[in-house]
Amino acid sequence: MSEKNMGGTASVIREVFPISENDVLRKHQVLLRKTEYHTNCQHKVRAIICKIKLYRIQNKYALHIPINACGRGLKIMHIGPVLMNGRVTVGKDCSFHINTALVAGGTSDDVPCLEDGVVVGIGAVVLGNVHVARNVAIGANAVVNKNVAEENIAVAGVPAHKVSNGGGLNWNKNRLI
């Protein structure tokens, strides 16, 4: 049934209860942090309730981010698939675009480690036992399968290699969640 046939009810509901991409991402961020808090403080019942709510929203929007994996300032730029291995380590103020993956390279011990300020572009994959330095920007559809030791650079390509000296510090990070 269209909005016109509903007498404008749908548009009124959208005005009163706006649900935008930012609202969903903010809700995910709050649930992720609440789940981490209650899990770390060993509030068993609250932790279970938060985990159920978190897993529902993660499955609905394909945001598979494990608890206690990311530092403060995590930014998910858009709703879409974001996949992280359960043992991955992500530093502070990192940003992820849609369709990104931080995954193991064959064994569960070989997981990526991202330092502070890393920006992961659309469709990028960080694969295996890889260490990515501070303020590195990973380009769209890049596959990072080797360590990136130099700070504040941009890498792109398959396999990823340095393409410029402008890294995550130069990235537009006005979008805060």
Language-model features: where?
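Terminal amphipathic alpha-helical/low-complexity segments used for targeting or macromolecular assembly
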Residues: 1-61, 167-177
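Short, T/G/N/S-enriched strand-turn elements that build extracellular solenoid repeat scaffolds
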Residues: 64-65
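Left-handed beta-helix
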Residues: 72-73, 77-86, 91-92, 96-98, ...
